[in-house]
Amino acid sequence: MLLIANIIVFFVTFLPDFAHSYWPLTLFGAYPSPSIGNVIGKFGLVPALILNGDQIYTFFTSMFLHADLIHLGGNMLFLYVFGDNVEDTFGHVRYLLFYLVSGIGASSLHIYAALSLGGSAIPTIGASGAIAGVLGAYFVLFPRSKILTLVFLFWITIVAIPAVVFLGLWFVYQFLYGSIGAGGGVAYWAHVGGFVTGIVFGVAWRGRRRKRGL
C-alpha cells in the first residue's frame, strides 16, 4: 500500500510536465521540473519553518515526495525488499503508523542536525527516513535473514549477507557521513533518526512477544 501510494504521488506530482516534450528528462532529473519545484516549496520539509511552527504538515507530506524517478526507484526497492516482512509482523495498520512515526523521527533528527550544521532553509523530501525505520525494525526482528547483495570485486557477484551485517554496515555508513557533514543532497541524519526509531519499535515489539510467550 505504501509503495503504491508513493508511486501514485510521484506521477501526480509530475503530471503537469507530461504536457511538455522534455518530460522524460524531468522524470530522471536531467532537466529541472517546474512542477516538482512548486510542490517541494509547498510540501517539502524546511527545518527553519518547522522551528517557527509553520508548515507542520510537511512532516507527513515530505515523506511521500521524490525528486525524480531514480530517487523514487531506490527508495521503493528498499521498501519492497524489507517492508513486507516487517508489515507481516506488525500488521497492516500498526505498520502504517510505525512507518509514519519513523518518518517523523527521521525528520526530527534531520531538523536538529540542519539547525546545528547549517542548511536549515533547504527543503527535504523523500521516503528514505521512514524506510530507514523499516530497516531498523528489520535489523532487530530478522537479524539472520540473508540479503542478496551485488558485490564488486574483480568481477560482479551476488553474495548472501546476513541482515545484521548488511544493515549494520549501512547504518555505520550513514552515521559516519552524517558526522563529517557530508551532503550531496542526502539527508544522512534523517536516515540515522529513522533507523534508531525502527530499532526502538523492533525491540519493543520483540519484548511484547516474549511477555506473551510467543
Could you tell me what each predicted segment is?
Residues 1-214:
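A detector for small-residue-rich transmembrane helices and their helix-helix packing motifs
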